[in-house]
Amino acid sequence: MQSKFKRILFGGDYNPNQWPKEVWEQDMAYFKDAHINSATINVFSWAKIQPSENKYNFTELDEIVDMLSNGNYDIVMATSTAALPAWMVKKYPETMSTDYEGRQHKFGARHNFCPNSLVYQKYAKALATELAKRYSGNKNISVWHINNEYGGYCYCDNCQKQFRVWLKDKYKTLDAVNDAWNTEFWGHTFYDWDEIVVPNELSEEAWGGMTSFAGISTDYRRFYSDSMLNCYKLERDAVKAIIPDALVTTNLMGTFKGLDYFKWAKEMDIVSWDNYPAYDTPWSMVAMTHDLMRGLKDEPFMLMEQTPSQQNWQHYNSLKRPGQMRAQSYQTIAHGADTIQFFQLRRSKGGCEKFHGAVIAHVGTNDTRVFKETAQLGRELESFGTRTLGTRNKSDVGIIFDWDNYWALEYTSGPTQDLKYVDQIHHYYEYFYNKNISVDMIPVDGDFSKYKVIAAPVLYMVKEGMKEKLEQFVKNGGTLITTFMSGIVDQSDNVHLGGYPGPLREMAGVWVEEIDALAPEQSNTVSFSDGKEYKCNLLCDLMHPEGAEVLATYESDFYAGMPAVTKNIYGKGHVYYVATQLEAAGLARVLDEATNEVSVSGVIAEETGLEITCRESENTRFYFVMNFTDEKHTLPASLAGMVDLITGEAAKEGDVMNKWDVKILQEAL
């Protein structure tokens, strides 16, 4: 596909308004040294450009835009609406959010506005309109960046009133609400819309973050995601009313729980996101999150933020080791990014982000390790130009990721507090990552026909239409892999009666009678037909085969001998049911069989400790070969002879790759 950009955007957040003019001039020289070609500006400038209710002052922003335009930078223009000016909060305190404990916030920090405040909406839309009018003719503005990292929660009266409106639109009648939420439980029946209150610590969620009514709490999550999305759309539409062909985005946050990003992506021209792994985040988790961001629109995405060196807000803000930032950046491109952008370009001198990494450090020179590594990456990206732009990642495997399931599964008050949705998804993704098998992260309403294998771990909530969609996929020859805690509830978190796994029971060929929860110090053992045994933990389904072939059984406890892994023929395809959390080797045993029988393989045949990820154009395949391990690895023989896009030299059989080494090898198709 054609890229939305003419070059790889390389730059990041830039706040010259925090510095005197002589620093601006020095920055321009340093940016050229680092081969930086883009800047994200105006992210938190609302107070500067609108100093009072009826006054705008664009003088400084005009100077910044002119400076960057004269230097031929691609500008990412933010709308500044993520941090409210003090005058607004003073005059209109209702613009601030009310937190989980029922306390209304005062001025300060960010991520604390009420998305259902009509005052906030009015002034945010007006500001976006003024910015679009003022800079509509500037050809250097490549992207419009709405708000910043939408997040936070509000439980104020405005939100409560709008929640009731949202419910009326969704359910039409109170009888339908009562039925969906099963309000006969604990005598919660509603007879008037005004009786419905927001679910927070003062109401349904008063016990340790869990909820008395997951149906109510999950609906509030849906409502709040929609409320935030409406704010985004309000500003987006204001910009597009002036600039119809504007490329509009907002920066997402990976597996952030608060917002349904698949729904958001439908309203975004391009997905962008901020990547901040911790010092101990597995590289497979980083890769999975990139794939999720790519999967939101099934298109290349923008990396809007990463740090060139260290964060400031995690528990342990370790430095990126020499070569790590470069390798991490290439992993980002490998999984679908068409931009590499940092937060930030010059390190802040004050505030809570003064220790957050930047291209230009507090010493204020270009003679630092981080600057030199940034410049090296900039030179390399500039040298191979547009060749990777718009190229696609192709996959035979899809993994379902669904925010409704994310919310509902973690709201449920049983059977274990240790069940975490993202961890379960990653447990399966990691197998494919280690095998260098390309994966698409897909929504429940995606096109399943593109895949040979679909994994749906902990598909707890099977909503309307999902059963039929999955059945059609399997009947047509697809392989479905699902697990414990699947098929349990409907879209309102009411149990599918008739035995677990509910709507999946027929195609899986099993009936789950009970679910045993194992404490962290407990485990069981699973034995396969060849006698090989593997540990399992967390949960154990006690299930009965109803036509499915038993591949493995439990070895201990009163359910010893009962099935732990099954395989069922359904139409032309197969359904694997994994009834417990298997250790990695045991899961690999199951997934090896599932992938081999439908000829799903890695991007190369050889086994290797290197990550190898592919992007393709119509006539070229690019192999991104990266070493994220502590060991040296030899380049797989099948890649020898291909030209490295970075060096221009042909790779040789026996080439040794040290930790953080990267090659981008080209193959003509």
Question: What positions do the PLM features span?
Answer:
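Short, well-ordered coil/turn segments that N-cap beta-strands
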Residues: K6-I8, H35-N37, S69-I75, G137-S142, ...
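An acidic-aromatic substrate-binding cleft motif
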Residues: M1-V23, M28-S38
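Carbohydrate-binding surfaces of carbohydrate-active enzymes
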Residues: I196-N200, D245, G254, A265, ...
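Conserved, mostly hydrophobic/aromatic
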Residues: G12, F31, A39, L68, ...
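Aromatic-lined substrate-binding rim segments of carbohydrate-active enzymes
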Residues: Q26-K32, T40-R103, A132, E235-I242, ...
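Short, acidic/polar
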Residues: Q18-D33, A124-E130, M253-W264, R321-S329
